[in-house]
Structures are given as structure tokens and as C-alpha cells.
Amino acid sequence: MAFDYVRAAKYFVLWDFIKGFALGMKYFVAPKPTLNYPHEKGPLSPRFRGEHALRRYPSGEERCIACKLCEAICPAQAITIDAEPRDDGSRRTTRYDIDMTKCIYCGYCQEACPVDAIVEGPNFEYATETREELFYTKEKLLENGARWEAEIARNIEMDAPYR
């Protein structure tokens, strides 16, 4: 009999409505879990693999020694390298192209590079209007490296204990 009184009291007090309203107010005042993307950006992992870049030494010399390990290990065959010897006996690239339409962003090129010349940087916003813009030349890759060098160096330093 007491159970019927409790059930009737909950019915007349609109207990289910009050519980639902309280739950709605809880989420109304809580911080939003979503980001307003173009204006707000979430954090990226130091291991994030984005747009490719070629790095230079602090002296300004290109890091790439034209060993062609990245070209050999690329499963998509997206990298093309031509090299020639210099006067001091070392090799330097004359052509370093990446076909981004073929690239699968596996990161093997970055792992294979003995001098950390080719890296996948933190930039993920590189949509283009034409397909030709996705064929990266050596100049474009060096420009990306110059633009993102500080962040790339920080990410490599943070990832160093795991390499």
C-alpha cells in the first residue's frame, strides 16, 4: 500500500520531468566537448604525420645526403630523387619530388632517413584546388621545412627517447 502512495506522489510531482530537466541543465552548464574547428584547433601528437618537409642544418646547408633510402623504402613509390656528386666528394640532390597523390603517410621515409632530412610535419591543412599542386618539388619541401622548423625540431626532440 505504501508503494502506491510513493508512486502516486512521484506521478503528481512530475518526478521524471524533474530528473530529465536536471540532467539537461547538467550538460547545459558543462564545458562543450566539441571544438569550433576553423577557429579552434585541438592538440596534435608529436608523432603526427602531416605535410612533408625537407630540413636544413642551422648553417643553412640542406640535410639530405642523397642516400635514396627514403625512395627505396617508400611502399607507394611516391618519392623520386636525382643526385650528383659535389666537388668535396659528397652527394646532394638535384631533384627531390614527392607525389602526394600517391603518398600513404606511413612515415617510413622519415624513419629511414639517417640525417632527419625528410620529415612529416605538423601541418594537416593543405587542401588544393588542382592536382598539380600535390606534386611537391624540392623547393616546396624546403619551404615547408623552413616554415615548420621550430615545431618539427621540438617534435623530434620529444620523440627522441622512443627512437
UniProtKB/Swiss-Prot annotation:
Topology in the lipid bilayer: Peripheral membrane protein
One cellular component term from this protein's GO annotations in UniProt: plasma membrane
Keyword line: 4Fe-4S, Cell inner membrane, Cell membrane, Iron, Iron-sulfur, Membrane, Metal-binding, NAD, Quinone, Repeat, Translocase, Ubiquinone
Cofactor(s) the protein requires to work: [4Fe-4S] cluster
Annotated cofactor note: Binds 2 [4Fe-4S] clusters per subunit.
Residues reported to bind [4Fe-4S] cluster 1: 64, 67, 70, 113
4Fe-4S ferredoxin-type domain mapped to chain residues: 55-84, 94-123
Main location: membrane
Entry-linked Pfam families: Fer4_7
Cysteines paired by S-S bonds: none
EC number: 7.1.1.-
GO biological process, one term: aerobic respiration
InterPro entries documented for this protein: 4Fe4S_Fe-S-bd, 4Fe4S_Fe_S_CS, NADH_quinone_OxRdtase_chainI
Annotated catalysed reactions: a quinone + NADH + 5 H(+)(in) = a quinol + NAD(+) + 4 H(+)(out)
Keyword Ligase recorded: no
A single GO molecular function term of this UniProt record: NADH:ubiquinone reductase (non-electrogenic) activity
Family annotation (SUPFAM superfamilies): 4Fe-4S ferredoxins (SSF54862)
Cellular localization per UniProt: Cell inner membrane
Function, in words: NDH-1 shuttles electrons from NADH, via FMN and iron-sulfur (Fe-S) centers, to quinones in the respiratory chain. The immediate electron acceptor for the enzyme in this species is believed to be ubiquinone. Couples the redox reaction to proton translocation (for every two electrons transferred, four hydrogen ions are translocated across the cytoplasmic membrane), and thus conserves the redox energy in a proton gradient.
Subunit structure: NDH-1 is composed of 14 different subunits. Subunits NuoA, H, J, K, L, M, N constitute the membrane sector of the complex.
Family membership noted in the UniProt record: Belongs to the complex I 23 kDa subunit family.
Record's protein name: NADH-quinone oxidoreductase subunit I
Organism: Rhodobacter capsulatus
